[in-house]
Amino acid sequence: MDLMKLITVNASIEKPVDMVWEYWTNAHHVTHWNFASPDWHCPSAESNFVEGGEFHYLMAAKDGSFEFDFWGTFQKIEPQKSIEIVLGDQRKMIVLFEKNAEGTKLTEQFEPEQENAEELQQAGWQAILDQFKQYVTS
């Protein structure tokens, strides 16, 4: 995947790669971790997890003030290694699953959007990844 400037977030998770992969790719699990702060949630998640398939995750403020469909298309899937995605706004993203001595290093790299500062985007995506880690390890 040819990527432009990237923002990178990662987490070291003390669980095996197959479990981390399952929790990241299975839409049932996504609703439990795909939010950056306690005042947001992911009330629905649908995913056709095959190359060329799409995912649609509804991201919503719990007070009902705002919601959006975070979606994309899976371009290339290497089971338990990597997932290449083109997001709905045509930005590219790659997710890497690396086995290590502690368990799994999960890395997400994505092209920034132009509306928000890159630091804000990195902080938000890292917060979601931190929620993911907490969900997987609880």
Where are the predicted features?
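Glycine-rich portal/gate segments that line the openings of hydrophobic small-molecule binding cavities
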Residues: 41-85
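A short, structured loop/turn motif at beta-sheet edges
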Residues: 16-18, 49-50, 75-80, 96-105
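Short, surface-exposed coil-to-beta transition loops
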Residues: 6-8, 67-71, 90-94
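Hydrophobic ligand-binding cavity/cleft-lining segments
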Residues: 1-40
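Beta-strand/loop substructures that line and gate deep hydrophobic ligand-binding cavities in soluble
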Residues: 82-127, 131-132
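Hydrophobic pocket/interface hotspot
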Residues: 20-21, 30, 55-57, 74, ...
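Generic C-terminal helix-cap and adjacent flexible tail
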Residues: 2, 134-138
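Charge-dense, helix-prone N-terminal extensions
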Residues: 3-4, 10-12, 58, 69, ...
